[in-house]
C-alpha cells in the first residue's frame, strides 16, 4: 500500500506573547492507504495539533505535510480549502449538526456543498451501513448522542473522501454508544477500505484500529502494529 499521508520534520509553533511554544516538534509520520490509525497520548502532547495540521485546519510552521501527494505547506488558502473539501472528512467530539435540518438534510447538505450534488445511491449505501435508515426524518434534538455522531460520520464520508480525521469521536458518548460508533468506523475501514486517523486518549477505543501511535511532548515515541 502507498502512503496517503506523510509528514516530514513537521513543526507547529504557537505564540504565547513573545514566546514560541512548540506543539509539534519534528514529527515524521506516515499513514498507508486503507489503514485505521489511532494517535494516543496525554493531554497537551500535540495529537490534536497533528490532526488539525493534517486536515489543513492549521498551518504548519516548518516541514512538509503531504495528503494524497499534495503538500499542504506549499498551498495557498484557497487550494488548501479545496483539497480539504474534496479529500478529507472530519468527525469531531462535538457533532456540529444543523438543528433545523433532519438527519437526511444534515447528510445531504454535504453532497450539495462539497460534492457534485445529491447522489442517492451513495446516500443509501452510507445511511444503511450506519444504521440510520429509520432515523432520517429525525432532527438532532430527537436523536441520542450516538445517533447524532453516526449522522456526523455519514456526513463526513458521503462524498467518498480519501481520509477521515476523527478527533475524540466518542468523547461525548456513553460506553454503549461509544462501542457502536467505534464498531461502525471499523466497519467502514474493513468493508470500504476507508483510511482513518483517530485521536483518542482511550486504549479501548484505540483497540479498534489497525495501528496505534503514541505521542509525548510533541513527538511520536512509538507506533505499534495491531496483532
Residue ranges and their predicted role:
Residues 212-224:
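H-loop (His-switch) and adjacent beta-strand-loop-beta switch element
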Amino acid at each position: 500500500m502507498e502512503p496517503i499521508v506523510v509528514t516530514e520534520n513537521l513543526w507547529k509553533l504557537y505564540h504565547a506573547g513573545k514566546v514560541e511554544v512548540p506543539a509539534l516538534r519534528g514529527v515524521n509520520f506516515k499513514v498507508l492507504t486503507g489503514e485505521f490509525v489511532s494517535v494516543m497520548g496525554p493531554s497537551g502532547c500535540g495529537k490534536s495539533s497533528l490532526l488539525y495540521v493534517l486536515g489543513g485546519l492549521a498551518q504548519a510552521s516548518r516541514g512538509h505535510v503531504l495528503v494524497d501527494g499534495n503538500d499542504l505547506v506549499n498551498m495557498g488558502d484557497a487550494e488548501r480549502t479545496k483539497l480539504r473539501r474534496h479529500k478529507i472528512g472530519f468527525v469531531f467530539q462535538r457533532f456540529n449538526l444543523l438543528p433545523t435540518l433532519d438527519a437526511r438534510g444534515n447528510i445531504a447538505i454535504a453532497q450539495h456543498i462539497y460534492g457534485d450534488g445529491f447522489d442517492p445511491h451513495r446516500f443509501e449505501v452510507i445511511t444503511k451501513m450506519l444504521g440510520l435508515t429509520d432515523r432520517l426524518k429525525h432532527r438532532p434534538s430527537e436523536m441520542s448522542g450516538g445517533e447524532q455522531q453516526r449522522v456526523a460520520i455519514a456526513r463526513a464520508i458521503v462524498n467518498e473522501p480519501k481520509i477521515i480525521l476523527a478527533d475524540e469521536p466518542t468523547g461525548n458518548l456513553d460506553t454503549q454508544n461509544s462501542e457502536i460508533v467505534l464498531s461502525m468506523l471499523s466497519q467502514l475501514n474493513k468493508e470500504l477500505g476507508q483510511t482513518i486517523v483517530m485521536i483518542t486518549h482511550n486504549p479501548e477505543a484505540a483497540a479498534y484500529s489497525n495501528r496505534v501511535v503514541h505521542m509525548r511532548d510533541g513527538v511520536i515515541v512509538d507506533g505499534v502494529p495491531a496483532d
